[in-house]
Amino acid sequence: LQESFPNLNLLFNPEFLTERSANFDFINQSRFIIGSSGQPYNEEKSNQLTELFKQRFGNTIAVLQTTYETAEMIKYMNNCFFATKVSFMNEMYQIAEKIDANWDEAVSGFVTDGRIGHTHLGVPGHDGKFGFGGSCFPKDIQAMINFGETIGIEMEVLSAVWRKNLEVRPEQDWKELKGRAVTDG
């Protein structure tokens, strides 16, 4: 896009918001990513946007200035990692059910290791269903699988994540979201 419109200063600022709490997530972001063209990055405009973020959110918030490609990669890495975490937890839940293990105790013991984190662990999830749905994870997992294959990388891990999700969430409710309008409700 930047090549098509060289006189425009385009920046890419991926969002890291959840559908159910987008307003809260926006106000409480952990970092801002600013992607721009080339090296050095569009420094003047990136710096202006950085200053705007710091004025609004304070100096303690991390701001990473990078290329378009790296900014997009960061966004996909986040969503694909969280989708992987959901699929992993669903698979562990299936095992716990089979061996009659106490799922809640198992999860409590699991998260005492601080490296695990406390998000994307619920089985069933926040929507009362197994696996992941919504408008981001299914789309982003499929996009990364297809992109990897396009550039000659076999996407075994993400393909397995996708297969597990199709198994535990056979209704594929994300397909119902096409053309959906976003509201603040």
Each model region followed by its residue ranges:
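Internal alpha-helical scaffold of NAD(P)-dependent oxidoreductase catalytic cores
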Residues: 1-13, 18-119, 147-154, 164
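NAD(P)-dependent Rossmann-like dehydrogenase/reductase catalytic/cofactor-binding core
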Residues: 97-185
